[in-house]
């Protein structure tokens, strides 16, 4: 039964018959109120019965009847047509979508008609309709459609709402004559490519667009437009009747289309606007509305998004299959067939099976077809028939299939090929084969990670890591990462790195330590595939340790020889070091475009080289490191005409520990600047562009004071600079010698020479100031942080040998975070001895070495107060 009331279609004339003095404004308000009432009824009905198709149909009918009544009362020339076009013409009117209309004028029309049409459009807006309209003659429509495929597409789905049926049929006939299916196909295919490129060719972003993203509703519309242009059907049922899609595909398409339509409807109602992006603001509420519940393993929103990603994955697949099918139907030329082997051939550069049951009869051919694409670069992909056959037989990839020696050899061969490894595995994932072959992989397909720094699903991230490893193998890309390319070229058995990449995050979402759980899966895989013990041990170790190098580089003091020695003892061999370095770089770069930067690259490279030196030098010692750094610094200082006697006083005052904390380049730079100022009365602040090529390095030398760190952090925070490294050091003569590396957060273009002078002058003034420190700024947190709460973790460990505590703070990053932490230290009378700042996207993982005053351990009351303050950040 329709929920549409007959009240809404009462005409203005009827509404005013009982009272001739009713104003036009009152009539408009009446119509507006009735429209809103009926739209509210539609919303309530949908939320009660959750019938997506009924909502779209009834909303379309509601607007149809309203427009028809208004048109009738407007008394417009009978030769004029009112047409529904676009999504409205298709009969899919979402709650807050534009109502796309075409007012089709006769070739000859006068000023009066133009005025009537203009008044009509104004009335539609006045009563609350979001109208997207065009007013054209038939000739103008043809001209626009000839030059703009978007206009032509919009008119494909036109419906006559009111006006001359004869005129409309003439218009349809003219538009049909204009259609050139081949040209239309080429234009739409290019349009889809461009649209996908706007979303970085991935459907798996954190906040996808339900309508426009790859795998979204627009990819389904694309199929219907192209089929319609060839007169093969205007809807899915017609396509099935015309054998363009199978009955099984019909059911799957309808299921996944309905899933996205339901999400889009609910999103409109939640946002109370035409919002097609699955923003963080709505994901939690949408998930709850749809009945998802948070578990100890997955948030409700993660389950919602996994359902969404699996739908868009299927839609992307069926889009590929049907576009190839429709392209084939357009071809008037016999295909060029090239023999490949007994099972496969190339048809117009697409891999095809020689018989319809090839994969059924020879299951190993399921993997073979991916291998052939690697071995035959002239092939551009798989034919529609082969893709369909893959979907039909993929359940054959079962335990018996995985136990087959032939199939195991084929999979290892895919990983060992020189070309196409990334493309093959990505295709295997897109077509549902990779998850069948590696069951653990199936569980993480479409699984989002709300950890504030991964911006892709787990499966997409894994494939990104693999793609990054493959980039190291390409000589034409060696300029991107010269060291990685050099190491990769010399690394035997690179397929071991690919296996480690596949398994490094495969246990995400299971609960527990994903590295340990993934190691079990990796060992099982290696054993099943007959890898030698040494190779198996390497892969398993890489999966278990894949976070270690990143954590060490970003959280530990790499200038401390003890840190390097400890890491060297952990990796044990240069082969392991090389493998872990390559995997780590690929992993970090695969998490998010925002996470990787030159600073992180320099940290990892420094750790690699330092560890390699230790592994190759059995006589390594801390004293050896100190001596070497002093020698290198002295060589640099000699180039400036400085002899040892000139800076010896400075070196005596900084103490031996200084040469452990700072690298030779920093020692030389600081010595050159501070030699005349060993007992300076005023702060010495010097800034330079970081030698790593990313950020600014700032040195502060001044008499130590309790609020020094807080003042410095506050200053950089108000400059909108983020601190990526802080080295805090106190000399024997009680001077603070601190070094900060900062990065610009604003992205503004600046004059660096002026900026460096500004920092030197203004920071000196801030340090000398006797006024209280300004309260840290409360910057706006990102929407992701706001809507995906991340519990702050405070880990405090006593170092009894040094009377200090190691503090690890893991929390959502935000502007002013470090300034607030410094302010807390000041309030609680806590001394800071070192800081390691690590930002991963929207997540901060910072480390601090702290103590109470006079170098004592914190007492229980201070520990409780510190934890309480930090948890309130």
Model-predicted segments: where are they?
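Long, K/E/R/D-enriched contiguous segments that form extended
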Residues: 401-500, 509-515, 520-527, 537, ...
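Non-catalytic interface/linker regions that flank or bridge core catalytic/transmembrane domains
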Residues: 1-13, 17-84, 91-93, 99-454, ...
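Conserved catalytic alpha/beta cores of large enzymes that bind or transform nucleotide phosphates
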Residues: 129-132, 142-143, 397-408, 470, ...
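Hydrophobic alpha-helical scaffolding
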Residues: 110, 174-185, 206, 210-215, ...
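Regulatory modules associated with amino-acid/nitrogen control
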Residues: 259-262, 285, 292, 299-351, ...
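Divalent metal-dependent catalytic cores for phosphoryl transfer on phosphate-bearing substrates
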Residues: 91-116, 241, 253, 457, ...
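Short, conserved secondary-structure transition motifs
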Residues: 136-147, 542-551, 742
